[in-house]
Structures are given as structure tokens and as C-alpha cells.
């Protein structure tokens, strides 16, 4: 079993910075704001070929109220999940009452705990950590996570010996296939497209929407545990959380994202970071669930987010949350508004649910699988060309300057989203209305549901363009005889 290491401490002691160092990513938000990390953030790390899971947690300072109380609960849950705890303190701030309270709790859990004093850059490490011996946790390991100083020593002298003592049994990571594919893509070693099997990889599912529409409640309902901080306050999820899961024998990676606000309202620098994370999560996903609040209706921000999803070419499932408790009259009004404002999204399934009570949630994954299968289905050139020919027979392309646009053949140009490349003459002059007709014809013929489909046009090249008319020897002899005949006749 892969060991789990939790980073625990007061807010702003550098847990996320160390997390990014250990996992060699920038997945955890890092800035000089207390309470920046609100949820457990999981990452994969490695030292000398030994893998471990690192958990970045929200800070605990003993003065929590409101959402901070829930942050503290998330940190305590991380301690329970972990095999070993790295308890981080701030060498510059010195020993604080909250440090003593955390140390007391850790001693009561009897977990292997190592005390790490961060922010020792520019200080005498020996002098800076003296006060922390009062915590009674043994040796102190000074580091400067932002510059990487002392981190390698921490790994070699603390985590590596501990993992060797742990001697984990060889087991197959249930998500190994996902990570192997991820690394192959990072190294440019992905398999040839012909060998690619979309069913062999987890479906990456991003849950997005405006703040406080119920994204984290939906995530927790799907997972069956309180994994993401939920509180009735906009913006309680500031980072994107990647969660492996399995449902009906199919593997998924669930991405719970920060709520997206209007740009004009994003004044907090941290929230700007989160919006970028959300948009990156959409790019990284295979299927996106757009969550809309039934009681607030569709806002311009919902439409902006929808536009980004469509431009990214991601498969889409629209989820209208908080459907419970609405009168029948209000429900009809909401449906009419949806039809009016989302009429251009005719390929996406719409689900009406209550994430809080669970009604309608069970039907979501059928649409997710349908959308993913539609976006990754392989279709041969012969079938695409046949569909194109039928479309042309049903409705001829218009005349352009007195000449009919000629479509020759079609082939697949990519997947997720499906791309159909059509070759022909004068295709650049096709009107948008005919392009939409072709797109809808391909969608209907291929039964593509839940995924956008893109049509690209390529102009057929004239093989004789810019070439001199070179005569063959036979043509040359005929030409000579013709010229002699013309001269004699004169």
C-alpha cells in the first residue's frame, strides 16, 4: 500500500509550498494569505523510486469560526488518513499557542510525527528552532521550502528511512494506469492513436459553476463522504480537487473546482488564482458538468463559462441543482428560461437534481459515459465520406460565382471533441448555414450526444497549378507534323 504523508500546521506556515516541492507541481495555491488551503489536497510524490501520497491541509489556529472550523475538521481528517505527519511551524513567528494545541493533538493520536521548522532562510537555524523543543516532539528539521533548502535532507533523513522501516507490500495502485498514461503524455511517449483505447483510462470529470451553486455538495453526494469543504458561503472551494473514484465498474477522476465569478467581482488575488485553476481543470477534463442554481436562474456568467467549455471542445452535461422545494409553476418557468437561453446547446443532456437530498444524482453518470463515448468513438474514413455524400444528396451545396461547391471526401481529424475534416473545391466559400447543416447531419448520423462536433474544411489542390504544360515525346512528334502541315497549306 502506498504510504500517505500529511502536512499539518497553522495557516501560512508554508504547507502548500512544501507540497509543491514534494510533488514537483504548482497544484496547491501559494500566496501570503492565512487560510489559503481550505480542503485536503492530494498529490503523488517520489523519492529514490519509492512513491508516497502527500496531503496538503487547511491550517488550524484554534480561533476557528464559520468555514474555518470546517477547515480544521478537514485537517484532522487528514491526520487520521495519514501514515506519517509532517508538523510544520514558522521559525520566523516563533512558538505560538496554536502550535502547542496541534502538538498535543498529534501526541494523542500516536502517529509517527516529524517537526519541520520552515522559513529559516536568513536565520541561524539552531537559534531559530530552540523554542520548538518545548513541544516535546523530538528532533527539529529546519527548512526553507520557498527556496528548497533543507527539503532534500528532510526527504533523505526522515521520509526515506521511515518508508524503509515501513516496508510496504507490493500492491498494484488502483489508479496506476491513469498515472502511467499521465507520465507518458508528459514525456511525449503516448501510444499511437490506433492503439489508444479510451475505455482503458479513467474519465476525467470536472464539476464547474458559479460560487455556491452546490458543486462541492454534489461531489460529496457522489463520493458518499464529506471530502470537500461545504459551507453556505460563496467561495468555500478555492482550489481544484482531483479525486479518483469508481462507479459501476468504470473509473473516474472527479475534479471539484472553485466557483467562477464575474471578472469585475474578482478582487481577491487568491480568487483570481482559483479561476485560472477552474479553467485549467476544464481543459484537463474529458467531460464537464456545468452546475446551475435553479433558484437564481441562468446568469451571464453561466453563459460565459459555457462558452469557455464549448471553445475547449469538452463534452458537457448540464446540471440544474436545488430543484427540490420549487413549486410546479416555478419549475415550468425555469425550464422555459433554459430552453430560451440554452437553445443553442442542443447536444447536451440536462438533469434536474437536488445534490443536498440526492434526488436525480444517480442518473448523471449515464449521461457522462454517453458523452465520453461519443467524444472518443473512432469512425473510419469510408463511413464519414458516405455520410458526407448522403448529406450532399439530401441538400446540395449552394452555387458560388455560378459554380457548385464540390465536396470530395471526409476523414477523422481528431477526438475529444470529434473532428471531421472535409476536402473539396471552393469549400472556403461555403456559407455558415451550410456548415451548420453538415455539422448537424454528422451529429445525427453518428448519434453524437453530449459532445460538440467540429467540421474543418480543406481546399483540394490543383495538381497542375503553377506547372508548365510539358509535352510527351508522342505529343511532340504530333506537334511537329501539325506544324509542317500548316506551313505546306500556306
Swiss-Prot record:
Sorted UniProt keywords: GTP-binding, Nucleotide-binding, Repeat, Ribosome biogenesis
UniProt-recorded Gene Ontology molecular function terms: GTP binding; ribosome binding
PROSITE patterns: G_ENGA
List of residues binding GTP 2: 209-216, 256-260, 321-324
Record: residues binding GTP 1: 9-16, 56-60, 118-121
Keyword GTP-binding: yes
Residue ranges of every copy of the EngA-type G domain listed in the record: 3-166, 203-376
Gene Ontology BP term (one): ribosome biogenesis
Ranges for domain KH-like: 377-461
Protein task: GTPase that plays an essential role in the late steps of ribosome biogenesis.
Xref: PANTHER family: GTPASE DER
Assigned protein family: Belongs to the TRAFAC class TrmE-Era-EngA-EngB-Septin-like GTPase superfamily. EngA (Der) GTPase family.
Binding partners and assembly: Associates with the 50S ribosomal subunit.
Protein name, UniProt field: GTPase Der
Organism expressing this protein natively: Escherichia coli O6:H1 (strain CFT073 / ATCC 700928 / UPEC)
Gene: der
Amino acid at each position: 500500500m502506498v504510504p500517505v504523508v500529511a502536512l499539518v500546521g497553522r495557516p501560512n506556515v508554508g504547507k502548500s509550498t512544501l507540497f509543491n516541492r514534494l510533488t514537483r507541481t504548482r497544484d496547491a495555491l501559494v500566496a501570503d494569505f492565512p487560510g489559503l488551503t481550505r480542503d485536503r489536497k492530494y498529490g503523488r510524490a517520489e523519492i529514490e523510486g519509492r512513491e508516497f501520497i502527500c496531503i496538503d491541509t487547511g491550517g488550524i489556529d484554534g480561533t476557528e469560526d464559520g468555514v474555518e472550523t470546517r477547515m480544521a475538521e478537514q485537517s484532522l481528517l487528514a491526520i487520521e488518513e495519514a501514515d506519517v505527519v509532517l508538523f510544520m511551524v514558522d521559525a520566523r513567528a516563533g512558538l505560538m499557542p496554536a502550535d502547542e494545541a496541534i502538538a498535543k493533538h498529534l501526541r494523542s493520536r500516536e502517529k509517527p510525527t516529524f517537526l519541520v521548522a520552515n522559513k529559516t532562510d536568513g536565520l541561524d537555524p539552531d537559534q531559530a528552532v530552540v523554542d520548538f523543543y518545548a513541544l516535546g516532539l523530538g528532533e527539529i528539521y529546519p527548512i526553507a521550502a520557498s527556496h528548497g533548502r533543507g527539503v532534500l535532507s528532510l526527504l533523505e533523513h526522515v521520509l526515506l528511512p521511515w518508508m524503509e522501516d515501513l516496508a510496504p507490500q507490493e500492491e498494484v495502485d488502483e489508479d496506476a494506469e491513469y498515472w502511467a498514461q499521465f507520465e507518458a503524455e508528459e514525456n511525449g511517449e503516448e501510444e499511437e492513436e490506433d492503439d489508444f483505447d479510451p475505455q482503458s483510462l479513467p474519465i476525467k470529470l470536472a464539476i464547474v459553476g458559479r460560487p455556491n451553486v452546490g458543486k462541492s455538495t454534489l461531489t460529496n453526494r457522489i463520493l458518499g463522504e464529506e471530502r470537500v469543504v461545504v459551507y453556505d458561503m460563496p467561495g468555500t472551494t478555492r482550489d481544484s480537487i482531483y479525486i479518483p473514484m469508481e462507479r459501476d465498474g468504470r473509473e473516474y477522476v472527479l475534479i471539484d473546482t472553485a466557483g467562477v465569478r464575474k471578472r469585475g467581482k474578482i478582487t481577491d488575488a487568491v480568487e483570481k488564482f482559483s479561476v485560472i485553476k477552474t479553467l485549467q481543470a476544464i481543459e484537463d477534463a474529458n467531460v464537464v458538468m456545468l452546475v446551475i442554481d435553479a433558484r437564481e436562474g441562468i446568469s451571464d456568467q453561466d453563459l460565459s463559462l459555457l462558452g469557455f467549455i464549448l471553445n475547449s471542445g469538452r463534452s458537457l452535461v448540464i446540471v440544474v441543482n436545488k430543484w427540490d422545494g420549487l413549486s410546479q409553476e416555478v419549475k415550468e418557468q425555469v425550464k422555459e428560461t433554459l430552453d430560451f437561453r440554452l437553445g443553442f446547446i442542443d447536444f447536451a443532456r440536462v438533469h434536474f437534481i437536488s445534490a443536498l437530498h440526492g434526488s436525480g444524482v444517480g442518473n448523471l453518470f449515464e449521461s457522462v459515459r454517453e458523452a465520453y463515448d461519443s467524444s472518443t468513438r473512432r469512425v473510419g474514413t469510408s463511413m464519414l465520406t458516405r455520410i458526407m455524400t448522403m448529406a450532399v444528396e439530401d441538400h446540395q451545396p449552394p452555387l458560388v460565382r455560378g459554380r457548385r461547391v464540390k465536396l470530395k471526401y471526409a476523414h477523422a481529424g481528431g477526438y475529444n471533441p470529434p473532428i471531421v475534416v472535409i476536402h473539396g473545391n471552393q469549400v472556403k466559400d461555403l456559407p455558415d448555414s451550410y456548415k451548420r447543416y453538415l455539422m448537424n447531419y454528422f451529429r445525427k448520423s453518428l448519434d453524437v450526444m453530449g459532445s460538440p462536433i467540429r467540421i474543418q474544411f480543406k481546399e483540394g489542390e490543383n495538381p497542375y497549378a503553377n506547372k508548365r504544360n510539358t509535352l510527351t515525346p508522342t505529343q511532340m512528334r504530333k506537334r511537329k507534323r501539325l506544324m509542317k502541315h500548316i506551313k505546306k497549306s500556306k
